[in-house]
Amino acid sequence: MSGDDSEMGRGVQGSVEADFPLKELYLSSHNSTLTDSSLFVPRDRPGTSDIPVMKSWLPYQELSISKHVKTLVKLQPASPLDMEGRRVTRRTLSPGPRVGAVAALLGCWLLVIPTLCSGQTFTSFHPERREWAFNHLTVHQTTGALYIGAVNRVYKLSGNLTLLVSHDTGPEDDNKACYPPLIVQPCSEPLVSTNNVNKLLLIDYSQNRLLACGSLYQGVCKLLRLDDLFILVEPSHKKEHYLSSVNQTGTMYGVIVPSLGQDGTLFIGTAVDGKQDYFPTISSRKLPRDPESSAMLDYELHTDFVSSLIKIPSDTLALVSHFDIYYVYGFASGSFVYFLTVQPETPENSMSSGGSTSDLFYTSRIVRLCKDDRKFHSYVSLPVGCVKNGVEYRLLQAAYLGKPGRVLAASLGISAQDDVLFTVFSKGQKQFHRPPDDSALCVFTIRDINARIKERLQSCYQGEGHLELNWLLGKDVQCTKAPVPIDDSFCGLDINQPLGGSQLVTGHTLYTETRDRMTSVTSYVYNGYCVAFVGTKSGRLKKIRVDGPPHGGVQYETISVIKDGSPVLRDMAFSLDRNYLYVMSERQ
């Protein structure tokens, strides 16, 4: 279904089995009290006497934060008929029962949704400075606390967005040319006050700590105690501790793989901005249980001949001057870790081109590694995208790993407990840094992705074709024939690796939008139905029921959630009780 065709109205991170799809929207005005120089919180929860009720598709009440925060509303269950595709009609009802709040982290001043909550009063939360934008958010799956990574700050908030703790990460005097960084040894370069952009925010549940990585000092990380954001350790004395000095958010992604009773592993992918000698583009690192361990963030394996990392060769950067790999999303499923990336194409006939970024063609790819593979022999990378009516969507914007629910699973030929990957792509393969508004919501099954990777491995081990990883190998390398059985858990050998491919892994296109580029996606399951929530370039939220092939998806409605039209960012998360939603945006 297309965004242009829908007459159902125009239209958030975690797939959850919701108790009900929320439909009734309660709005409330209430007083607030100043508890901090930058934080306003409500004195009381809304009662029932002052709650006018409006019907809406919006499945979650909303609360926002990003330079500021707004608190809002809650919704009652929708009827089964509404889940079958009927449009929900707005009308005023009598006040409903006492309700809580739903939240969205949004980047605007005292945000008001004109169509739903005109005249309402909202609480607000904002950083010390307007330019210190929010970058990442995550919700603790046991306590429900929110952790927000921002420019120069890490915040811990309660579920209703009350500020609990703030940890300073910048600004500090620095210079990107200082290597090793200033905190290790003096630097002769001129130093200037430099902001610290949060690029990675991960909860290490097994050790009750938060990993926060920024752009300062060549990309140093901190391990913070979850309770009070106290610094447990800030590793910085080895070159392995510098992840990347790129100060752009959305270019790095990490996945923590815990190990019961043992040290965990951090898989991390990052853009390197031409500093391939300093930073690997992808690596796996140690996460010792002891924060003071000298092995903290060391590579899992590092010898002269084999290592748990891959670097972009200098020859590639010499031939394709703007080459880099941007890591959009990552996750673990089964025995594997996956990353979704966007990178310039480097076919054989273009490796001698050093054109501008506007001349480059970009490819979105899925990268798979075995969780226990310290040698990276299991590295496989295949292109991914969607096609609708002959139009290719190849520029990845966002992704989310979720569950399909009974209805979508049946249409995809999988179990309701299988993993599915929701993705948003923009049209074409050019202008990655300024993607087209024409975009598509698609779904892949992890089972299909693994099957395509298995086929690629089997073909190569039969001696067919080449490794097809020109950006890394610099040339076409013939696959080596070897009588090796390739099963579903195959993790590679010291031949035929690392392995690429050129055959597109195509997802199922669910929904397209030609004018308001989709920028984020999440999902939840109710009564067997899968519902996707999609943020857009203009600060809107879409609700889409996902039926899968051949019907695609049905958009119910769209609501404007950001007054100044700032894009909704990738990070979205449900609250612990699954009745709340947090959506983030920054002032562009």
What are these regions (language model features)?
Residues 1-83:
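Intrinsically disordered, low-complexity basic segments at termini and long loops, enriched
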